[in-house]
Amino acid sequence: LIEQTRETLVDMGKLTPKWQQAALKPLASPKLLRVGSVALAIANKTGLLPDRLGLPDDLPIRQEPLVASGDDVWMFTGCVMDAWQRDVHQATQRVIEAAGFGVRPTSDAAPCCGALQSHAGMGSEARKLATKVMRSLGDKPILVNSAGCGAAMKDYGHLLGTDEARAFSARVFDVSEFLADHVDKFPTVKP
């Protein structure tokens, strides 16, 4: 209800100014997001940005790519999470692999779930991104380590209102939720 109201207010020009809408566009473009993130990291590390922006001090300038180890599950990497916290994805992938699953990071194939656009009342853009994500990922389980992305993707059935979207959402799991259901796959550790 709140996001539908926001979308109506955006359409009326009463919420989310054009500059904010424009600022969200690079999230759907991995190359633009990487370039912008590196520029932000450099500006932040050199003290060019005010502290009130609240940017993390450890924004990465360079990151190692995520490499697929199989195709048992998708690991959704998203936009901001991948650009600013790829180390969390790397740790997540190691844990999933320890449970015996091959992992295929989504990376550029599905770069943005549309959660931020939806929250900003940009429903049309959120629906486009949701459709792109759904078309990009096969029929394997999709594991997510970002609560915002996971909640948005589990809501695609409601956002798009199709059986296809509802079936897709049923394949989305928080990584902890998925691993809890497969705890028997982990190797036994002796004290």
Where on the chain are the PLM-derived regions?
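Iron-sulfur cluster-binding electron-transfer modules in prokaryotic oxidoreductases
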Residues: I2-P191
